[in-house]
Amino acid sequence: MFEHYLSLFVRAVFVENMALAFFLGMCTFIAISKKIQTAIGLGIAVVVVLAITVPVNNLILHNLLEEGALSWTGSEQLASLDLRFLGLLSYIGVIAAIVQILEMTLDKYVPSLYNALGIFLPLITVNCAIMGASLFMVERDYTFGESVVYGVGAGVGWALAITLLAGIREKLKYSDVPDGLKGLGITFITVGLMSLGFMSFSGVQL
């Protein structure tokens, strides 16, 4: 069991990296990767959101939305309902609630990070990496335990990617980059090269 969870975690971090394998959450990924400190802060926020939303959405799916999920009510009519068409709406609601709680927490206890993240903190709500993790969980039919491990792993993978990119971009400030590639140009090339590097993990059998 432990080996299964460990392989799932490693696969989520390296083999199926949200940013560098699926290119999810690229808007925030590019915009907040200018400084390592800010990138780490946002990375931790994404880890927290994914670690909570994926398992919670798993519970909602298996206890409320799936056909037969409402059998615990004792009503045959309710038990026969298939409410999976409400999945996207439910997942978005959970993600928005968790992000709002995180935003209020950072505003109160870590105002410097809250100000540094700016508009991109509430935009975690519409970060497709967050929704993508929940949809992957549904598609792969993860158990609750697997969804916890996958949520944390997906968050750690995204945080690792944005931190690495931020470190490279800080070094690029002192590099002789051609004028036509300064800014987003060299950043996109860097992300592409990082993605090629992470592709080497695709051959790992877990």
Curated annotation (Swiss-Prot):
Pfam families, alphabetized: Rnf-Nqr
Keywords attached to this entry: Cell inner membrane, Cell membrane, Ion transport, Membrane, NAD, Sodium, Sodium transport, Translocase, Transmembrane, Transmembrane helix, Transport, Ubiquinone
Membrane-topology descriptor: Multi-pass membrane protein
EC number(s) from the headed UniProt entry: 7.2.1.1
Listed GO MF terms: oxidoreductase activity, acting on NAD(P)H, quinone or similar compound as acceptor
Enzyme class: translocase
A biological-process GO annotation: respiratory electron transport chain
InterPro entries to which the protein is assigned, alphabetical: NqrDE/RnfAE, NqrDE/RnfAE_oxidrdctase, NqrE
Catalytic function, reaction form: a ubiquinone + n Na(+)(in) + NADH + H(+) = a ubiquinol + n Na(+)(out) + NAD(+)
Membrane-crossing residue ranges in chain numbering: 12-32, 36-56, 85-105, 118-138, 148-168, 184-204
Location(s) in or outside the cell: Cell inner membrane
One GO CC term, this protein: Gram-negative-bacterium-type cell wall
Keyword Ion transport in annotation: yes
Family to which this protein belongs: Belongs to the NqrDE/RnfAE family.
Function: NQR complex catalyzes the reduction of ubiquinone-1 to ubiquinol by two successive reactions, coupled with the transport of Na(+) ions from the cytoplasm to the periplasm. NqrA to NqrE are probably involved in the second step, the conversion of ubisemiquinone to ubiquinol.
Oligomeric form and interacting partners: Composed of six subunits; NqrA, NqrB, NqrC, NqrD, NqrE and NqrF.
PANTHER family: INTEGRAL MEMBRANE PROTEIN OF SOXR-REDUCING COMPLEX, NA(+)-TRANSLOCATING NADH-QUINONE REDUCTASE SUBUNIT E
Name of the protein described by the UniProt record: Na(+)-translocating NADH-quinone reductase subunit E
Natural source organism: Alcanivorax borkumensis (strain ATCC 700651 / DSM 11573 / NCIMB 13689 / SK2)
